[in-house]
Each structure stands twice: as C-alpha cells, then as structure tokens.
Amino acid sequence: VWHCPYFCIFSSKNGQVGGDKYREYLLLKMDGENWESEEKVVNEVLIDHTGDFSGWENWMDKNKQGIDCKLRIRREGKMIFMKTENLGVSVNSISTVKDGTKKLYIALTGDQCAISNTRIFREN
C-alpha cells in the first residue's frame, strides 16, 4: 500500500535511522503490514477491522486525501506496546526486545505520503 505511514522501532548510537550501529526491531505500516526483524526481538501484531471499515479502496483513497491519526506507545521494561486505529483498521503490536538494549527510538515515516503537524503528548 502506497501513501501509508509506518513506524520503526530501532536503536543506533546517534539516535538516527541508519546511524552507526543501527538495529531495526520493527517496521509496521498503519494498514498492519509489517516486516520481520532479524534482531533479537519478538513482534506480535494484531490487525482487526471495526464497523467503520468500508474496504481497502476507500481506506487508501481517504489516506491519500489526508487523515488525522493517533498512535499510542507505552514501554514496560523490554516490551513496547503500540496501538493505532484509523478508518476502521485497528493495529496493536507488542515488541519484546531480547538483546538487553535499553535506549530505543521510534521513527514515523512513510512511502509517498506527507506527515505533518505531529504532536507528542505524555500520558501518566
């Protein structure tokens, strides 16, 4: 799916994607497609369609037009929980990092899409 943002959980020495000692733990698109990592991580991704889902063609068309979305991220020790829902597609993932890496980063990017007006909120 083009025009679809995705999230990357990674580590690197300088905190940059592709930086020195870059290691990728998860690459997850907002449509639920994901790539397996060769790193020491276990990724569980659950995709569900809610009553708001009206088909992939409609989903793609609305994404191309632009949508607002929220991503919730929570970390508990070596586990990272991510959850998002948009246009009836619910994506939940749990990544368990098993190599002892403490400093992890999340990048938001996309293929043939524009990402703007990004805001970060901390919930307690």
Regions found by a protein language model. Name each.
Residues N34, E38-E39, L71-I73, S95-V97:
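Short, exposed beta-strand/loop patches in secreted or surface proteins that constitute
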Residues Q65-F81, E85:
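Localized edge beta-strand/strand-to-loop motifs within extracellular or lumenal beta-rich domains
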Residues V1, C8-F10, R72-R74, K83, ...:
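Residue-level recognition of well-ordered beta-strand positions that form the cores
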Residues N14-V17, S95-N124:
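Ligand-recognition surfaces built from glycine- and aromatic
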Residues V1-I47:
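Secretory/extracellular carbohydrate-interaction modules
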Residues L87-V91:
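Short, surface-exposed beta-strand-loop junctions and turns on beta-sheet-rich folds
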Residues P5, K78-I80, S116:
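Short beta-strand/loop motifs in extracellular/secreted proteins, especially
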Residues E44-R72, N92-S93:
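Short, aromatic/His-centered strand-loop micro-motif at the edge of beta-sheets
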